[in-house]
Structure formats: structure tokens, C-alpha cells
């Protein structure tokens, strides 16, 4: 699973999911991309599951770019613990995604396979997504 090697602080506040991408996020590396349509947290496991789907359909031919990285730790306190007494342990890492963010890009595979694999990868995400084509 993806996680940062080191961070400035071990634990962070949860924060709020407000706003959108102000600079329009474009397809930079590949020809086809998966774009988010709503805000959310995407865990490192979900990123890995979608990566596996895309690489399985691309076989040996294509190249894949993952444009998000899980750099926010999510903590949980143990069950039946009293209030107070510090923050819980880091359980997993998430990437903060806003509407319009490019999640994955592919290059070097046919249009039908690229669109289909990105569509299936979108089903692995906890947010609505769409497949876009580089103009």
C-alpha cells in the first residue's frame, strides 16, 4: 500500500472537504484519464485496487500514471476507550480529492480498452468519476 516515508507530524486533524480544483486539472501524461466529480477521501487500498484493474486490462502494452498520493493519516481510537486520553493510532492513509482532480492516466493502449479499464477502476472509487480523453 502507498504511504509516505516520513511526515512533519505523525497525526493530523480530519479537516473538511470544501472547494474544488481552481486550476483546471488537465490530462498531462497520457491520452485517457479518470477524473473525480465529487470530493472525498480515497484510501491507499482503493488506489491499489484500481491500479490492479487498469494494469490487468492494459497487459504489457500501456503505461499508467497515478496522479494522487495518500499523504493524510486517519486515526481511530480503540473500542470502549474513555473520552480524552490522546488521539488514536494511525490506521490507514488517504488522499484528499476534490472535484475535477485527475486520478489516473493511461497511454499506449487502444481507446476501447483504455475507456473500459478506467470505467471499471472508477467503480473501485468511493466517489463519482468520469473518463476523459486528451484533446
Swiss-Prot record:
Superkingdom classification of source: Eukaryota
Tagged with keyword S-adenosyl-L-methionine: no
Any one GO molecular-function label of the UniProt entry: rRNA binding
GO biological process: mitochondrial translation
Keywords assigned by UniProt, alphabetized: Chloroplast, Plastid, Ribonucleoprotein, Ribosomal protein
Gene Ontology CC annotations of this record: chloroplast; mitochondrial large ribosomal subunit
Subcellular location: Plastid, Chloroplast
InterPro entries in the cross-refs: Ribosomal_uL16 (IPR047873), Ribosomal_uL16_bact-type (IPR000114), Ribosomal_uL16_CS (IPR020798), Ribosomal_uL16_dom (IPR016180), Ribosomal_uL16_sf (IPR036920)
Key word Ribosomal protein present: yes
HAMAP family: Ribosomal_uL16
Subunit (UniProt): Part of the 50S ribosomal subunit.
Similarity section: Belongs to the universal ribosomal protein uL16 family.
NCBIfam families, per database record: rplP_bact
Name of the featured protein: Large ribosomal subunit protein uL16c
Species this chain originates from: Euglena gracilis
Organism taxonomic ancestry: Eukaryota, Discoba, Euglenozoa, Euglenida, Spirocuta
Amino acid at each position: 500500500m502507498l504511504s509516505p516515508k516520513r511526515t512533519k507530524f505523525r497525526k493530523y486533524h480530519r479537516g473538511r472537504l470544501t472547494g474544488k480544483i481552481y486550476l483546471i486539472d488537465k490530462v498531462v501524461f497520457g491520452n485517457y484519464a479518470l477524473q473525480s466529480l465529487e470530493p472525498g477521501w480515497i484510501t491507499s487500498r482503493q488506489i491499489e485496487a484500481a491500479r490492479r484493474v487498469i494494469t490487468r486490462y492494459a497487459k504489457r502494452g500501456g503505461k499508467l500514471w497515478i496522479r494522487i498520493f495518500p499523504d493524510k493519516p486517519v486515526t481511530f481510537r480503540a473500542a470502549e476507550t474513555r473520552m480524552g486520553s490522546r488521539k488514536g493510532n494511525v490506521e490507514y492513509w488517504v488522499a484528499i480529492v476534490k472535484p475535477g482532480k485527475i486520478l489516473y492516466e493511461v497511454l499506449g493502449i487502444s481507446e476501447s480498452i483504455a475507456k473500459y479499464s478506467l470505467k471499471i477502476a472508477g467503480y473501485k472509487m468511493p466517489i463519482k468519476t468520469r473518463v476523459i480523453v486528451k484533446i
